Amino acid sequence: MKKLIAIIAVAAVVIAGFVFTANQPEQAEEVASLKTFSSPDEFREYLAKSAEISAFYPVVYTARAEVMVDSSKGAPLGEATPTAIPAVTTTPERYSETNVQVKGIDEPDIVKTDGVNIYYSPFPFIVYIRYPEKYYIDTTKVIRAFPPSNLSITGEIKESGNLLLHENVLMILNSEGIYAYNTETQKEVWSAEFNGSYVDARLYGGKLYVVTRSWLNFGEPCPIRPLTVNGKSVEIACSRIYHPTIPVTVDTTYTVVKLDAKTGEVENSVSFVGSSGMSVVYMSKNAIYVTYNSYADPAKLTYQFISENPDLVPDWIREKIEKLMDYDISSRAKQVEIMYLLEQLRASMSEDERLKFENEYYNRWENFTKKHAREIEKTHIAKFSLQLEAEGMNSVPGRLLNRFSLDEYNGYLRVATTVDWDENDLYVLDEKLEVVGKIQGFGLDERIYAVRFDGDVGFIVTFRQTDPFFVLDLSNPENPKIVGELKIPGFSSYLHRIDENTVLGVGREEGNVKLSLFDISDLTSPKEKNRYILQEYWSEVLSNHHAFLLDSQHGIFFLPAGQNGYIFSYKDGLKLIKAVKGNAVRAIYIDDYLYIIGPEEISVYDENSWEKVGELKLQ
């Protein structure tokens, strides 16, 4: 029996990598809605049904763990250690902001600037870093940056994490909580402690949107208390915890809390059940989207497979399974019975018959999953307003790569997914999350490696052996089209539109970091007009877009790679104009000065001459 169970398990999980979702009208109608729990008992009942689904299938790695944006707390909370701050005698005309997905919605990162000061948290994830003969204690440094002649450390806050800056309030977010400081006095103004895990955050319009994750408490699933702000616990009642109307695989509860960035006052909160490691958080200027992947009833999966392959088993097996599906027992019990019936069949066979059956079962399952690829794994999308009210829910086939797989534009949500690891889709959803347009089945035998949407145009990179670069015309939401395609060696993991006619791709080729400039002046005929291979095996930009900086005024961009920093011009093709040796992790610009920042020092360059005009040792 173990061998047959293994065949079924391998067929159902390893080949497909996920589970069939029955395509039935009544289920489709249920999927498109959200509701809240009325009581802890209803929550527990939902969790019990969800457990039936997940019991047979392990958590499958899908996209990058987009929600796992974790930071470790540093030293115990303490006062900043300020020094005298020189008076500001000049004001810069311009300064850079963190490279974010949606312009105007800030994202946490290790470096922030207000045009005069740099706030830098070198080690947001750990308490101590060991360098030869040195220990570095994690802190957040306050650095007078402008003008470069005043470059100096003016304070040190004994907290570290990813940073957000709103006017004169610096927020430090780590796995323990949020610590907000006045940038002028460097004194704490408010704080919050996480009772669960920190997931991600956004800053928009003076409001801080924080996403946390709380593991389920089956004994007392609600209310939940995700965080404590200024000593007061935030409590989410059952009536503010949303769930899909049908049970899906869940193991955690996500909470979005909206706070005033200056005071920490909690303005609203909402929770939503989901699955850890398989959810993506995306925020536009109109809504917050939370996604998760669902897995359908395994008994229905096997029943449908056998129904579509009637010659694989005798009639008595099919009839018993059909009758079994009407029993009022759990899905898990049904699946155990189905596997027992199939083992009975296997035991009745001769060795030759058994060998043929096992091979047929395995291969037909593979064909079955190909046929039903878009019904196998679903990405469910829940939409909440910025006032944290539920606005709808729906699903699309496949799985997301990361947050860049989602984009809202003119009231429509564009979603890029990979289906069954070897083909890809694009869906356009309206404000009610109804699918109004789609492209299916491009990049065959490949999966998505990079996505970037920009207004009416989209760019998608897929990869297995070559790097197809697809250009999408999204001007008509009901009829999106692939209008251009280019195949080149290697792949891009990050795409950035440099200007109207140019897209930069950052990726890899033959083990090295590769930069590609794509000419999109003719959307129907994209071209790789220039490429550059760095003698580095990795760049943080491949997995973290915050590490990238574009200065369009000077026609340059910065990226870290390996342990070094690189500055390229792009006006007349890719030209390396500056390479900075050693621990360069971020860059910012203030007026015409480029500051290259690393754990040990900050170097300042004049962007007109590229001469070094300042340096500050941080250790």
Swiss-Prot record:
UniProt keyword annotations, A-Z: Signal
Domain of life assignment: Archaea
Signal peptide: 1-21
A Pfam family per the record: Beta_propel
InterPro entries hit by this protein: Beta_propeller_containing (IPR019198), Quinoprotein_ADH-like_sf (IPR011047), UCP006425_b-propeller (IPR014441), WD40/YVTN_repeat-like_dom_sf (IPR015943)
Name of the featured protein: Uncharacterized protein AF_0817
Species per Swiss-Prot/TrEMBL record: Archaeoglobus fulgidus (strain ATCC 49558 / DSM 4304 / JCM 9628 / NBRC 100126 / VC-16)
